[in-house]
Amino acid sequence: MVTTGAVVGASSGCSRVATADTGDGGHLLEQLRAKGTVRLGIAGEQPYGYIGADGEITGSAPAIATRIFRRLGVDRVEPFPTEFGSLIFGLNSLQFDVVAAGMYINPERCEQVLFADPEYQMKDAFIVPRGNPKKLRTYADIARAGARMATGIGYAEIDYAKDAGVKRIDTLPDQLAGLLAVEQGRVDVFVGTAVTVRNVVEQTKSTKVEATDEVTPYLDGKPVVDVGGFAFRLPERNLWAAFNRELHKMKRSGELLDVMRPFGFTKDQMTDIKAEEKCRP
């Protein structure tokens, strides 16, 4: 494994573009086996994929990927940290091989990448000042209060907030930046996935903010069940299919929950939803 600095340095000036789909399912799996290494695109977001205090890649998605790729004959994983909003571009410009960031699956993204079936389902939660003085428990509450909201760059929560009528939306690099913005009074609320919000509040031991209970987002008046999964380049169907087979074996055996539990996931976040269901417009 390599450190953050080594990977970022290696990415400078990358101008490669993805090759066209030849219709044969791609050859990336064979290439990865020959190299013995797979590069994972991560967004530095706990608990999905990030660099730990020891300089090594960690998180639920890299932990899953490490097991699956070893079974596919690829023994090493390397991190490629980038901003969340750059993950799909980075994947399709060949900067790394797989997005391992717990990325939500939606129709817009499905036009650009090939998703494995999701490894988890998730609701949202808010970071608010201690005591939640504005009583923000839903997106509609944020809109009614005229509150200043922040979320991550490229997050699905932006659309949920707009759908609820939220007018003041800032974007920040990650959930830690969001927590600090709430602490310092620059925003009234930071919105993220429930497990992400809970983890960052617990780990920072902040006395100035708190995490709300889980929040169900809505689009067009309908509740949304978000699911997250690994993303592959569209031509690489052979790698995608092999990865998906191993992922389903982990689901059936209960191994998937065992791998994800140390990162704050529970049985409630396990899902049988298929990627194709979330890719439909």
Task: Enumerate the language-model features and the residues they cover.
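Extracytoplasmic small-molecule ligand-binding "clamshell" domains
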Residues: 2-4, 8, 21-102, 111
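Ligand-binding clefts/hinges and TM-proximal coupling segments of bilobed small-molecule sensing domains
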Residues: 16-22, 156-169, 241-281
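Flexible hinge/capping segments at coil-to-helix
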Residues: 31, 129-147
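Hydrophobic/proline-rich hinge and linker segments of small-molecule sensing/allosteric domains
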Residues: 39-45, 115-137, 230-233
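Extended ligand-binding regions for polar small-molecule ligands
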Residues: 62-71, 132-133, 140, 223-267
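Short helices/loops that flank or line small-molecule/ion binding pockets
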Residues: 67-71, 78-81, 85-99, 112-114, ...
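A ligand-binding cleft/hinge motif common to bilobed small-molecule-binding domains
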Residues: 103-111, 159-160, 188-224
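Periplasmic-binding protein-like
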Residues: 121-125, 205-244, 267-281
